[in-house]
């Protein structure tokens, strides 16, 4: 009886190691998804500003109506200039992109188009870095978590 309980405990410890690795991988995936959605948001805002010269309130209404960016919590946003950090995005990445929203609408014409293009490139670079991190995490974290869990189980057993 005692051996079965110990074996079950060891299996639970090994599983918790794997689950921790999976959770860390999932966190990287959600960060990548948030950056992809932000990149899409910036591209859509740029198109609306450049081609239609739409006001920011109309752009926000259009983005809310799309409902294909759930990770950005656009429903809670009253004005596009007050958009805050999405929950799945880390603070350093947001600090690099926050200027897009705070300065949005402060310039006109070509200056606004350059502003959008700059942040679109910056977001693309962040997304590419996040994609590489996610690919590495996918290959490493769950396996390393399982190995650490098994090692901890062996030490306890």
Predicted features and spans:
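Sparse, context-dependent recognition of short Cys/His-centered cofactor- or disulfide-binding micro-motifs
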Residues: 13, 20-23, 34, 44, ...
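Arginine residue identity/basic-tract feature
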Residues: 6, 29-31, 40, 52, ...
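Juxtamembrane/interface alpha-helical elements of multi-pass membrane proteins
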Residues: 2-76
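Membrane-interface, cytosolic juxtamembrane amphipathic helix immediately N-terminal to a transmembrane helix
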Residues: 105-148
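Juxtamembrane "helix exit" motif at the C-terminal ends of alpha-helical transmembrane segments
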Residues: 149-157
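Glycine- and small-hydrophobic-enriched helix-loop-helix hairpins
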Residues: 45-48, 53-110, 114-117
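Generic structural signal for well-ordered, non-membrane alpha-helices
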Residues: 36, 40-43, 95-99, 118-121, ...
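Membrane-targeting and insertion segments and their boundary/processing signals
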Residues: 1-19, 30-34, 86-97, 137, ...
